[in-house]
Every structure is written in structure tokens, then in C-alpha cells.
Amino acid sequence: MSKPLRIVFAGTPDFAAQHLAALLSSEHEVIAVYTQPDRPAGRGKKLTASPVKTIALEHNIPVYQPENFKSDEAKQALADLNADIMVVVAYGLLLPQAVLDTPKLGCINVHGSILPRWRGAAPIQRSIWAGDAETGVTIMQMDIGLDTGDMLKIATLPIDASDTSATMYDKLAKLGPVALVECLADIAAGTAIAIKQDDERANYAKKLSKEEARINWQDDAEHIERCVRAFNPWPMSHFEVAENSIKVWQSRVEASSHDAPAGTILKADKSGIYIATGHGCLVLEQIQIPGKKAMPVQDVLNARAAWFEVGSVLS
């Protein structure tokens, strides 16, 4: 049996916390945790600890929360830990080369896509947005580039037709910890194999924006439907009607032809709101009007039928 690793863990949100929890149940020793500084949250804007910090404190693990690693003090504090390896999961801080070089075995990262397909900030969302058949997690040896390091392990799973970014996030948060523990076992045993990425196959998964999430009815229905799922739970696909912003939580593509201008409401009843697009028809099934929770279209039509008159054209 190989010797347990002395691990420094760096991460911030719940996705990272689930990986930390797996490490705490493994043979390895988590000697310290790095996480983002406490941030104001909630209506009272009270300083709130990250999910990773919460778990670390529950297990009496030392917590470090530097704003960055520019100072000699921050770099020395990491060096003093004498870690074998640093595991980075959705940390949110850029790590300079000096930090990457500090642990004996360097730093590894759990990335939410099959590299090199989607590098960057929003790989889960972009995989749905692009219509990929599968996604997964890649564990890589970190280098100074953006998700360009050598790959140590890949675990995959299919993207179902009903998957949203929220459901994929949950699935990857279960897949990632298992892959991480398996990868660390290989590293500890000296059997891990590093595979270089093919840069020619790489795409940049840029951050999402509210502007991008505004529906363009000139797009084809299949693309809009993928956007609805990719942008759930944020920033939410939306459109304007009667000067109100309507968020779309669930939709489907109707395989029917039409010659109506894009944005035309073709039908509105309990089965959905049928809207002409640049190619095909999109059926809205669950939407959210201002001040209300998401609800089935039938409930919205009972109260706001005038907003969705057949023949009217959405901008």
C-alpha cells in the first residue's frame, strides 16, 4: 500500500466542498484548506463562510483565505505546510507559477469537462449549449495556462436531453470526487500517466451573461431549447412581453413547419405557448413572470392570457 499524501485543498463553492468531503473520507491527510475570503451574502449582507471553509472548520483543519498569492508572506505560508500535493477545485484565484511549484508533486485541478473540449469558466454550460452528447471531469496537472495542463484522469457521463446546467452540476459533483480519489491513488503509487492535450481541439468556454441569455427568435428552435437548459439556473433564458421580462425554465422543440415570422405566437393553451423561430417551433412549458415563482404555462395563461395572444409577435 502506498504512503498517504499530505494534501492542501483549495476550493470555494459546494462543488468543491463535495470533493473535500471525499478526501476527508480517504486514506490521505488534508493538512490545510485554502478558500476565498468570507463574502457578504443574504439580505443582511452578513459575512458568510464558503461551503469549503465550513467543512474545514468542522474537521478542525487550518483555513487560509488570502486575497491573492502576490505577497511573499502568502507564498511562504504555503511552503511552510510542506505539502505533497495541492488539489484545486473551483477555487476562484489564479495561482502563480511559484505556487504551482511549491508542493512536492505540484498542483492538480478537477475541471468540469472533458478536456480539451471546453477550457475556461463555464464548461458545464457550454457543453449543453453546444449540444454535446457527453461531458465529464478531467483531472489535470496544473500549469500556468488556462486549463492547458497534462491530463491525469478523465471520467465521462452522457448529457441527457432533459439535463440543465443545474442537473449536470449535481452529476459532476458526484462523479468528480470519485475520479479524484482514484487519481490520487495512482499518484501516490507512482502509476499516474500524464497525457498532453491536443490544443487544436480546444474551445474556450466563456462566461455567461444576461445579454447572451436574451432569446433571439431568429435562432433555430433546437438551439434556443439548448440555451434554456444551459442557462438554467443562471442567467436564465428570457424574453420581453408587455414590457415584462419572462424567464423560461422549461421548453421543448415541436417538429412542425410554419411560414410565420420568427417570434410569432402560433398557439397558446394548456399544452404550452408555441412560438415560431428561425427554424422550427419552440414550445414554452414552464415560465416565470416578474414577482412570481416559475409555474406551468397553463397557470400563467389563466392570469396573463392577454400577454400571449395568438398572432402577436415577440421582439
UniProtKB/Swiss-Prot annotation:
- The domain of life is Bacteria
Q: Which GO terms describe its molecular function?
A: methionyl-tRNA formyltransferase activity
**What Pfam families does the annotation carry?**
Formyl_trans_C, Formyl_trans_N
Q: One Gene Ontology cellular component annotation?
A: cytosol
EC numbers listed for it are 2.1.2.9
- PROSITE patterns named among the record's database cross-references: GART (PS00373)
- Where along the chain is (6S)-5,6,7,8-tetrahydrofolate bound? S113, I114, L115, P116
Keyword field: Protein biosynthesis, Transferase
What is the main EC category here? transferase
Q: Which reaction does it catalyse?
A: L-methionyl-tRNA(fMet) + (6R)-10-formyltetrahydrofolate = N-formyl-L-methionyl-tRNA(fMet) + (6S)-5,6,7,8-tetrahydrofolate + H(+)
Reported function: Attaches a formyl group to the free amino group of methionyl-tRNA(fMet). The formyl group appears to play a dual role in the initiator identity of N-formylmethionyl-tRNA by promoting its recognition by IF2 and preventing the misappropriation of this tRNA by the elongation apparatus.
Q: Which family does it belong to?
A: Belongs to the Fmt family.
Question: Which protein, by its recorded name, is this?
Answer: Methionyl-tRNA formyltransferase
Please name the source species: Vibrio vulnificus (strain YJ016)
Q: What is the lineage of its organism?
A: Bacteria, Pseudomonadati, Pseudomonadota, Gammaproteobacteria, Vibrionales
Q: Which gene encodes it?
A: fmt
